[in-house]
Regions:
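Active-site cofactor/cluster-binding pocket
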Residues: 13-207
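Short, small-residue-biased leader/transition segments that mark boundaries at the very start
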Residues: 2-9
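Long, charged N-terminal interaction/targeting segments
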Residues: 1-2, 137
């Protein structure tokens, strides 16, 4: 789908090159809510934004990837190999699966949580060892964190997605208030306080 405020681009963004972000994880982790928060934050800042969601298996356990591209004018939502400026990975095996899409100078944020894929659950394979070591050897600018424990400390394991949005926000040139407003406009009110706490735990993770 396409989000756009055609005449609301800030002056500094009029000729901004297109940036590409990928949000990757497995079904049930809240990746789609995360992409909605990201899209809302970007569009409120005046960018042309295109979002494309791809579900390998949208039920719990299947790989889910969302492409988000933004700039002064975006033609296609699809991100090709070697084009992503940032990859937000909700699970370490998914980070490895999509690593080739990252630019050489791109940023990779990884939730170190392990979620067994269906092939492991049914006994056809085992979860590989050394995933994070292999990723780190690839030379990407990587932030590894246990987002699950931060989410639990915020009040719910389900807040992993907003913790990770907070970490991503700390790597981007958008004002914190833009993110807070995007969360307020996206998350149900009864979960708002918990999610704002989760966002700040992520946002301040490296500070």
């Amino acid at each position: 789908y396409t989000l756009s405020l055609h005449d609301a681009l800030p002056i500094w963004a009029n000729n901004m090159e297109t940036k590409s972000i990928m949000i990757v994880g497995v079904g049930g982790q809240g990746t789609l809510l995360a992409s909605r928060i990201l899209g809302a934050a970007l569009i409120s800042n005046g960018f042309d934004v295109k979002v494309s969601e791809v579900h390998g298996m949208s039920q719990r356990g299947g790989s889910v990837v969302t492409y988000v591209k933004y700039g002064s004018k975006v033609n296609s939502p699809i991100v090709n190999e070697g084009e992503a400026d940032l990859i937000l990975a909700f699970e370490q095996l998914e980070a490895a699966r999509w690593l080739q899409y990252l630019k050489k100078d791109g940023t990779l944020i990884i939730n170190t949580q392990k979620i067994d894929p269906m092939s492991v659950i049914i006994g056809n394979s085992i979860y590989p060892d050394g995933v994070l070591d292999a990723i780190n050897k690839a030379g990407a600018k990587t932030t590894n964190l246990d987002a699950l424990s931060l989410a639990v400390s915020a009040g719910s394991a389900k807040a992993v997605n907003v913790v990770l949005i907070g970490v991503m926000a700390s790597h981007m040139d958008l004002n914190r208030d833009v993110w807070i407003n995007a969360i307020k406009n996206t998350v149900p009110e009864k979960f708002l306080e918990m999610n704002l706490k989760a966002f700040d735990l992520g946002y301040n993770y490296n500070k």
